[in-house]
Amino acid sequence: MSAPAQPAPGVDGGDPSQARIRVPAGTTAATAVGEAGLPRRGTPDAIVVVRDADGNLRDLSWVPDVDTDITPVAANTDDGRSVIRHSTAHVLAQAVQELFPQAKLGIGPPITDGFYYDFDVPEPFTPEDLAALEKRMRQIVKEGQLFDRRVYESTEQARAELANEPYKLELVDDKSGDAEIMEVGGDELTAYDNLNPRTRERVWGDLCRGPHIPTTKHIPAFKLTRSSAAYWRGDQKNASLQRIYGTAWESQEALDRHLEFIEEAQRRDHRKLGVELDLFSFPDEIGSGLAVFHPKGGIVRRELEDYSRRKHTEAGYQFVNSPHITKAQLFHTSGHLDWYADGMFPPMHIDAEYNADGSLRKPGQDYYLKPMNCPMHCLIFRARGRSYRELPLRLFEFGTVYRYEKSGVVHGLTRVRGLTMDDAHIFCTRDQMRDELRSLLRFVLDLLADYGLTDFYLELSTKDPEKFVGAEEVWEEATTVLAEVGAESGLELVPDPGGAAFYGPKISVQVKDALGRTWQMSTIQLDFNFPERFGLEYTAADGTRHRPVMIHRALFGSIERFFGILTEHYAGAFPAWLAPVQVVGIPVADEHVAYLEEVATQLKSHGVRAEVDASDDRMAKKIVHHTNHKVPFMVLAGDRDVAAGAVSFRFGDRTQINGVARDDAVAAIVAWIADRENAVPTAELVKVAGRE
């Protein structure tokens, strides 16, 4: 008989995610977890899998060959939730094949906050289908089917078993390392069978590397959320499948909190608000991922850009412009066509000349839409001789670039094909490099805070060993400098191994929005390679020639993406200084329109965007309409207001300030906007002369 499982030497119990347990050879991990007194079902911290000494996640049914230290993984951890979600995806696939026997299986990985599974079915799934599937899934969960790992004896055995599953067959030999391919990638080719808990007969199974929870009863709470079309493996050249999304959590309470979060996120969805607030659209006639901004959206965008221009001018940047297309040779020089061609639109072959008989007189050449501005900024630097006295040279451009994003990943304004980058490139000496990076990071953080984003951490992206240009020692120096500057900022610095672009390591500023979601925002990239590739030089004080250091920086990332993020951060209620309509006058009756027009004219003289609603709607309906359209200041006037030369403020939270002298009201609004207050104005926050 095996000795009882014990905590590993030097480590006591406590938090299961921090404990280590020794599993005797020939004993299941589940037995060791149970003997250690850790919960195995029914609580949010129940142990669902374990991590072995090599860091691999293992089923609780795993039996090591030798005494082994393991770390229990609880349901309420990231890894625990991921396993629960993957197991729930299997339950979904089982339900689909029971209710839709003709369905062929794609892939079904866990994803952030949920899971999905792709199916080849004749017709799209309907909401009624999802309800029926969820009902069957609950029955499967209640049955307590066992997840049983089975090793295929050979790939031939796997192919024979999967003969009627064409997509699974394709995965048997997959070597892509794609994180979303859960079917293969382990040391062995395995399947997970769902077994009847009483008879242990196989009910259903799937090609899968695992791990999984012990039984379907270990799925505490789940919900199917939606379905959509999706290309097999994300490639539009492949078959179009139907994808069902869902979510699963360690408790019903956690699921309920998540569903509330999803509801709020949907309310803030910039794609929805873009239509409701008449900000932007994506006409089919133009194409996927190509936005047009409407007048109201254009105002917000102009304000974003104008404030940025002002701050860049104050910081010593010089403004440049570059064309949208260029000869292919430029991107051969930069390396983009070697390392980034898949992200570029196809070339335009032009400039060929022909004789009258149709024979070629002058060959044409390829032109590309630019995916980045940096090569052109290198040419601007190289356009004339440069002295050390000019450095640091800070070039800035709102440059529109084009990237061939797959249609399946295009998403509103946050993932587009045509985007305008607030692109800066700084050329400096190596002696100036650290100070320039420090001031640049401070500039980025301060400017983001001016737009109301203040919760940051940093991510350091380092070299991809398979995809980089330049010498190893140059990369090491650049990475070390960025790490030092990031650490000096006092912000958390998270490593991102292999995440750098091909030409240099980078620091990215990660921002949390009002819902606590993280967005990659600004990037600061140190580059010793482009100056070498483009032959950039400056003359030092002693007359010798040197290569400058180049720093790439995009503060917003892109105007479009930043616009989308801000829209969701503020739920469409932009700060008054950004709002397309800052003030609307609402008359009690028609006879008060002329008075409010005078107030609006007074506001406009101070640069305030003011309108008067002279429609036939009743005042109450006008208030509801402009509240829904997120106008920060509503100014009301009736007989008493006109007689007293006053107005009343009405705010979106339904608070009100009555009888404010007209000049005082104008002064309060002008001051609020001039101060660039990012809060939503309320009766409590707005300061009016003579009122405490």
From Swiss-Prot:
| Ranges in coiled-coil conformation | none
Required co-factor(s) are:
Zn(2+)
Which positions does the record annotate as the modified residue N-acetylserine? 2
Positions of the TGS domain:
1-74
Keyword field: Acetylation, Aminoacyl-tRNA synthetase, ATP-binding, Cytoplasm, Ligase, Metal-binding, Nucleotide-binding, Protein biosynthesis, RNA-binding, tRNA-binding, Zinc
Which GO terms are recorded in the biological process aspect for this UniProt protein? threonyl-tRNA aminoacylation
Tell me the InterPro entries matching this sequence.
aa-tRNA-synt_IIb, aa-tRNA-synth_II, aa-tRNA-synth_II/BPL/LPL, Anticodon-bd, Anticodon-bd_dom_sf, TGS, Thr-tRNA-ligase_IIa, Thr/Ala-tRNA-synth_IIc_edit
GO cellular component, alphabetical, reads: cytoplasm; plasma membrane
Which of this chain's residues are annotated to bind Zn(2+)?
A: 374, 425, 552
Residue segments, region Catalytic = 269-575
> Which reaction is catalysed here?
tRNA(Thr) + L-threonine + ATP = L-threonyl-tRNA(Thr) + AMP + diphosphate + H(+)
The enzyme's main class, written as a single word, is: ligase
Which stretches of sequence are listed as region Disordered? 1-20
> Where does the record place it?
Cytoplasm
Cofactor binding note from Swiss-Prot or TrEMBL: Binds 1 zinc ion per subunit.
* Description of how the protein assembles with itself and partners: Homodimer.
Against PANTHER family, the record matches this protein to: THREONINE--TRNA LIGASE, CHLOROPLASTIC_MITOCHONDRIAL 2 (PTHR11451:SF44), THREONINE-TRNA LIGASE (PTHR11451)
Family listed: Belongs to the class-II aminoacyl-tRNA synthetase family.
Q: What is this protein called?
A: Threonine--tRNA ligase
Name the gene for this chain: thrS
